[in-house]
A protein has these predicted regions:
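Extracytoplasmic "Venus flytrap"/periplasmic binding protein-like
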Residues: 33, 50-129, 135, 160-165, ...
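Extracytoplasmic/periplasmic substrate-binding proteins
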Residues: 37, 56, 203-207, 212, ...
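Conserved C-terminal helix/tail region of periplasmic/extracytoplasmic solute-binding proteins
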Residues: 63, 160-161, 166, 243-246, ...
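Hinge/lid segment of periplasmic solute-binding proteins
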Residues: 70, 95-151, 177, 201-204, ...
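Short, solvent-exposed loop/beta-turn-alpha elements that line the ligand-binding surface or hinge
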Residues: 111-126, 169, 195, 212-233, ...
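Long, aromatic- and glycine/proline-rich binding clefts that accommodate carbohydrate-like moieties
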Residues: 125-126, 295-299, 345-397, 401, ...
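Extracytoplasmic/periplasmic solute-binding protein
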Residues: 136-145, 150, 174-224, 269
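Glycine-centered hinge/linker elements that transmit conformational signals in sensory
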Residues: 177-184, 220-252
Length: 427
């Protein structure tokens, strides 16, 4: 009896150990860090949480976990963590740093995964112009998430208060100044601008630089072209909205994209050059504002030389140092699926680069999306070179110096031009 009991105990122990062993993989679940600055931003966080919860429920062996970044210094932090081989498995950036990160070996090429998914047939699902931005030296380092041309939000009630017709928004730079002056009254200002050290500044500055005929680089891409009269004209126009025309709120150097949207949400400004999703963010900032009845979207005013606007291309990348590339790709592919991309538009109003969403009825019939999408043929990007982040940083310094009066626009731009040439020459 004792022997049988002993055998039973030993058998139970073996079975118990087997259960523990078999349960091991669940306990050692693969965690994929999904990094973006939008985890702390409404309404984006709603879409992100829904994605995370849906994926985790459908894939018990993999867990998507939040990894928060900050918009202003995301590139700097990613560089440091990549050098330490501790970067998030999947990270979110706009288009500007992709060549630099690829050149430095921080990003995992996606070509082998794409081939397994069908190669060119798989890639044909996405906006092809945006897809080109993901390519560097013959390899693909990302898929385009969203393609957001810039437009301008205007407060229709403010227009009517000062005798302006919101159905006839400013079409030229001169009209923009005229309207902004009329809209600047009491504690309210005509337009909000970004002066903070963040890449959102370029999406507001660039339409003026390019609209005047300016370019960042010479045609061969080897030298700065910021010493041209055209570049200076656009640069000065942007700066003088604050320094000369006084139609921008105080503290412009501290104002980033979210701060300016907050000004719009609380009716401290009447106009804001913005991304397509800005109206949703404004609604989240001030739920009491009836945004669809208050704000409408219009094109950015046309410059003296050409009609042009900037764009925000959203990209997700997989780190070259991920310890779980197959699991990371599974999460990555899920994010780019039709249902997730459509829900992202429904919640956050970003314009998906996935063609079956972009050309679908919801985006095609949305009043804001229609106006922003119509700006796509006029959208332009900064030079796609590894040196751009450093050149861009010098441009932001110049804008801040000119805004503050520390330097004249001419001197600030001259110094940025010299800095860009040093960068391009490898110094």
């Amino acid at each position: 009896m004792k022997r049988n009991s002993r055998r039973w105990i030993m058998g139970a122990l073996v079975i118990g150990l087997a259960v523990v062993f078999l349960a091991g993989p669940a306990a050692a679940q693969v965690k994929i860090r999904f990094q973006t600055w939008h985890w702390g931003e409404k309404p984006w966080v709603t879409a992100l949480d829904a994605f995370k919860d849906d994926f985790n429920k459908a894939n018990p062996g993999i867990e998507v976990v939040r990894d928060e970044s900050r918009y202003a210094d995301k590139e700097t932090v990613y560089t440091a963590t990549s050098q330490a081989k501790a970067a998030a498995d999947i990270a979110h950036f706009q288009h500007r740093p992709i060549p630099m990160f690829a050149e430095r070996g921080y990003l995992l090429p996606l070509d082998s995964f794409i081939e397994k998914e069908g190669g060119q047939k798989f890639l044909a699902q996405y906006d092809q112009a945006a897809l080109e931005v993901c390519k560097y030296k013959g390899k693909i380092y990302c898929l385009p998430d969203f393609v957001n041309p810039m437009g301008m939000l205007i407060n229709m009630a403010h227009y009517k208060e000062v005798g302006l017709d919101p159905t006839k928004p400013p079409a030229t730079w001169d009209q923009l100044v005229e309207y902004a002056k009329k809209l600047t009254t009491g504690s309210r200002y005509g337009i909000g601008l970004i002066g903070a050290r963040q890449e959102g500044l370029f999406m507001r500055l660039n339409p003026f630089v390019w609209g005047a005929g300016g370019e960042y680089l010479t045609a061969d891409g080897k030298r700065s072209a910021m010493d041209t009269p055209e570049f200076l004209e656009g640069f000065k126009f942007y700066v003088e909205l604050f320094t000369k025309h006084k139609v921008v709120p105080p503290g412009v150097i501290e104002q980033g994209a979210q701060e300016v949207r907050t000004q719009l949400a609380h009716e401290k400004i009447s106009m804001n050059i913005s991304v397509p999703q800005a109206w949703k963010i404004v609604q989240a900032i001030n739920p009491n504002m009836k945004v669809p009845e208050t704000l409408t979207a219009v094109p950015v005013p046309v410059g003296p030389k050409k009609k042009v606007t900037a764009a925000e291309y959203g990209m997700r990348v997989i780190s070259a140092s991920t310890k779980n590339p197959e699991a990371a790709w599974k999460v990555y592919k899920y994010w780019y699926g039709h249902d997730i991309q459509l829900r992202n538009f429904q919640i956050a109003a970003v314009l998906s680069a996935r063609l079956d969403v972009k050309n679908g009825p919801e985006m095609q019939n949305d009043k804001y999306a229609k106006i922003y999408s119509a700006q796509a043929p006029f959208a332009k990007l900064e030079p796609r070179i590894p040196e751009w982040p450093k050149i861009g940083d010098a441009v932001i310094t110049a804008v801040q110096e000119a805004f503050s009066g520390q330097k004249t626009p001419e001197q600030a731009l001259k110094d940025a031009h010299a800095s860009a040439n040093r960068t391009l020459s490898g110094q």
